[in-house]
Amino acid sequence: MDCKLHAKNCGGCPLLGLDYAAQLKQKEEKVRALLGKYGPVHPIRGMEQPYHYRNKVISTFAVGWGGKLTSGIYAANSHKVLPVESCLLQDEVLDKTMQAVRAAANACRYQPYDEDKGTGLVRHCLLRRGVATGQVMVVLVTAQPVLPGAKNFVKALLAETAQRGVTVTTVVQNVNSRKTSVVLGEAEKVLYGKGFILDTLCGKTYAISPRSFYQVNPAQTAVLYGLAVEAAKLTGKEVVLDAYCGIGTIGLTAADHAKQVVGVELNRDAVQDAIGNAKHNGVKNARFFAADATRWISEAAAAGEKADVIFMDPPREGSTPEFLASVARMAPKRVVYVSCNPVTLARDLATLTKLGYKAEGFTPVDMFPHTEHIETVCALSKRDIHGKKPSGRR
């Protein structure tokens, strides 16, 4: 499929020129080359419609033609903003919403932030959509706490989105006055609605705030988490540890099939979301704690605590030797490793294999079509497990 942005050095879809079937084959072969020696690699799970899957958009403001405000993404290997009217990966509702944001911002005569001079007002716009609910969030990131004519901006935005057939659920101002490439700041002000949206995933409803971690491809996330829970082989009697749990999506998906779930996540905002999500869904057998996963599991293992199943979903850099050693000390019957980087998964598997775990198999999931990223679900098992269960310690 042709894309004008791809021809302008967008850099967001390096595999766009490759037939989708060939993309899937390439990714599956990469996983097999890296992980095949540890166990069988099952066919990759691709998408039937590998376009417009992203439920989250981040757009950067800049000066466009005629001095008007425009927005888009940085061109590859540069700080030049490439204007974006629409994108083959983005939810089409969010494309229309961003068009409305630009129109409203121009109507209010907002000036884009200049990162070199430190002048201007609006820096970025973050958009999120609950695909199952249709709810839309607009987050306007400003360099200053005061947003002149905030009510007029909201009024103009709602009018512009309505003209495009879009209903906005909430509008939030996020303040980021630092000189940084990080998009969001710490301070927020709700300008319209409740400041969050809802979405449904794997039978559970999640509240998504501006800073919440939530997978950008809900269709493939359901596939990924379904595979992970299936790999755990839960019977309803297990105590489960959900490490690097984020807002609790894997743990809450597994909770219906387990005796108890204990989730651990470093990001305190995410943990608060996880606790709220458990309450909202009536899940009473899940507890979540804000802590570094390596430190938490090391202390739990040193205290002699055990788990029947451990889910681990670490960042791209993978886990740590200390974490993996503590996994072995906790002696779960099964470990389900959800990886977003097959290179670090291979590294961690070498350690887990030495610690007595065997990989039963790997299923790649194409979470991000037209990019080089690959998600992989790996199930590992170990026999003769005995000991105490996690107590939900702090």
Place the predicted regions along the sequence by residue.
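Short, acidic/hydrophobic/Gly-rich beta-strand patch recurrent on exposed beta strands
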Residues: 72-75, 139-141, 274
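Extended interfacial segments that mediate partner engagement and assembly in macromolecular machines
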Residues: 11-114, 127, 132, 146-147
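Short helix/loop segment immediately N-terminal to the Walker
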Residues: 112-119, 240
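Short, aliphatic-rich beta-strand segments
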Residues: 127, 134-143, 205-209, 309
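Rossmann-like S-adenosyl-L-methionine
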Residues: 148-394
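Extracellular/lumenal ectodomain signal focusing on beta-strand-rich modules
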Residues: 43, 56, 124, 170, ...
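Short cysteine clusters
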Residues: 3-5, 10-13, 340
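Nucleotide donor/acceptor-binding cores
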Residues: 55, 134-136, 237-238
